Curated annotation (Swiss-Prot):
List of residues that carry 4-aspartylphosphate: D58
Name of the protein in question: Protein-glutamate methylesterase/protein-glutamine glutaminase 1
Enzyme Commission number, as recorded: 3.1.1.61, 3.5.1.44
Entry comment, domain topic: Contains a C-terminal catalytic domain, and an N-terminal region which modulates catalytic activity.
């Protein structure tokens, strides 16, 4: 007996985009478009009729604001939503807000008239729809419940060995990273993060986090020193690596080929942390689709790092953590709301502030 196809409803005010999305989705053997809508009001009626598994939603819509529609949808009828965003500053800000409201993930709008690259784009959309269809989606009220307590400051004497927190995430990771970073104290060791995200969105992501956290959050720059009390987000379309300059840690950006079909890649960051950080590293792998980071986390463990993975129950998609656990790179499996505390508790076992200034 063949498995039922993933039912997709496409909502976009552009007839051309609706047509292209339908063509892409219907070309896949395991999914089909069961309806299209030019605006959220039409979509609202269609949802009741066709009961889709996944909704693709344009971030900027007529008649009803896309964010208003998403907020109501996640409160009244939670379902996996994949945002389709334009590559603009306004588009990236709206997309970040949509992810906060409960959207599972986003894709950028296809470049119309450019058939080259459409194959890669087709694969990306298909993969994200598959991941969305398996995502754990909760009502909004449930998502905001049980905020993590503030992690304790590290009050022990300074140690000459500088500690680092190295993080990888994908689908569902923007909110997971926020939940992980916000409890960290101002004297936290430096945090380096790869979140799968295209160019043009990571700066907005870092800016939004910076306004919420007690540490400074920024998009990583090539050659800058990696300092305690800072979190560095890998820029979209660039690998982020840990490097050394004398006794100091520095950020290194690379345009080398994608790894595991991703640039930035979690494995690339984790591999560099294994080489240059070793036992000074605490590794964290959060919600995400695929296996990026699994091999790198094992290499970090073999180099002396202590690694934690988000548990299945709190993941939007239990892909990357599951693969890292299966590969043998993980010491602890932890619910997201306890992750910051567990990381800081582990660092406290060093009996040191875990940083050098």
């Amino acid at each position: 007996m063949t498995a039922a196809k993933i039912k997709v409803l496409c909502v976009d005010d552009s007839a051309l985009i609706r047509s292209l999305m339908s063509e892409i989705i219907n070309s896949q053997p395991d999914m089909e478009v069961v309806g299209t809508a030019p605006d959220p009001l039409v979509a609202r009626d269609l949802i009741k009729r066709v009961n889709p598994d996944v909704l693709t939603l344009d971030v900027e819509m007529p008649r009803m604001d896309g964010l208003d529609f998403l907020e109501r949808l996640m409160r009244l009828r939670p379902m996996p939503v994949l945002m389709v965003s334009s590559l603009t500053e306004r588009g990236s800000e709206i997309t970040m807000r949509a992810l906060e409201l409960g959207a599972v993930d986003f894709v950028t709008k296809p470049k119309l008239g450019i058939r080259e690259g459409l194959l890669d784009y087709t694969q990306t959309i298909a993969d994200k729809i598959r991941a969305a269809s398996r995502a754990r989606v909760r009502a909004r009220a449930e998502q905001s419940a049980g905020a993590a307590p503030v992690a304790p400051m590290l009050r022990a004497p300074l140690l000459s060995t500088e500690k680092l927190i190295i993080v990888g995430a994908s689908t569902g990771g923007t909110e997971a990273i926020k939940d992980f970073l916000t409890p960290l104290p101002p004297d936290s060791p430096a945090v380096m993060i790869v979140q799968h995200m295209p160019a043009g969105f990571t700066k907005s992501f870092a800016h939004r986090l910076n306004g919420l956290c007690r540490i400074t959050v920024k998009e990583a720059e090539h050659g800058e020193r990696v300092l305690p009390g800072y979190a560095y987000i890998a820029p979209g379309d660039s690998h982020l690596l840990l490097a050394r300059s004398g006794a100091n840690y520095v950020a290194h950006l690379s345009q080398e080929a994608p790894v595991n079909r991703h640039r930035p890649s979690v494995d690339v960051l984790f591999d560099s942390a294994a080489i240059h950080g070793g036992k000074n590293v605490t590794g964290v792998i959060l919600t995400g689709m695929g296996k990026d980071g699994a091999r790198g986390m094992l290499r970090m463990r073999e180099a002396g790092a202590y690694n934690l993975a988000q548990d299945e129950q709190s993941c939007i998609v239990f892909g990357m953590p599951k693969e890292a656990i299966a590969a043998g790179g993980v010491h602890e499996v932890v619910p997201l709301h306890q992750m910051s505390q567990r990381v800081m508790a582990h660092l406290a076992t060093f009996g040191a502030r875990a940083q050098r200034v």
